[in-house]
């Protein structure tokens, strides 16, 4: 068989394998339940003001379903620090249900950015709480997040995504 024919067959095999792999990934994604909550907060000009709280409200549809809570911080490579302090509070009509302070390491000790992303934008995941929780079905909740850095205007943070996902029972 001529060389150019072998190369063409190899290319077709690669496309077939890539196509089958893509279908498999699509199948896996479609099998997972949709997120319970998925909220994006974007900061104008990548500037997060100290007095600008991220506020997310939700009312659980099913109190029997445990939920994993997490957030994604997307920052640019011009962010001036290696870390990000956040104050997070969950309130209900009964008062404060959960409160914490988290120090998210956006870079390692050598200054290399943590997280995923191939360009100037990196994404870092931070869980909220210690595991899956159940919320009361007849209650409305509010999550508030403010940054705890010394800057009045924190530059380099593009957005924060709050995502709650259904846990296995």
Model-derived regions: residue spans:
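N-terminal secretory signal peptides that target proteins for export/translocation
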Residues: 1-14
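C-terminal motif of bacterial Sec signal peptides marking the signal peptidase cleavage site
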Residues: 27-30
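Bacterial signal peptide processing site
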Residues: 32-35
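Post-signal peptide N-terminal segment of mature Sec-exported envelope proteins
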Residues: 39-61
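Short amphipathic, basic-aromatic surface patches that mediate peripheral association
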Residues: 71-78
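Short coil-to-beta strand junction motifs in C2/discoidin
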Residues: 80-86, 156-158
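An anionic, turn-rich surface loop/hairpin at beta-sheet edges
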Residues: 102-134
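Internal, hydrophobic beta-strand segments that form the core of beta-sheet-rich folds
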Residues: 135-151, 156-166
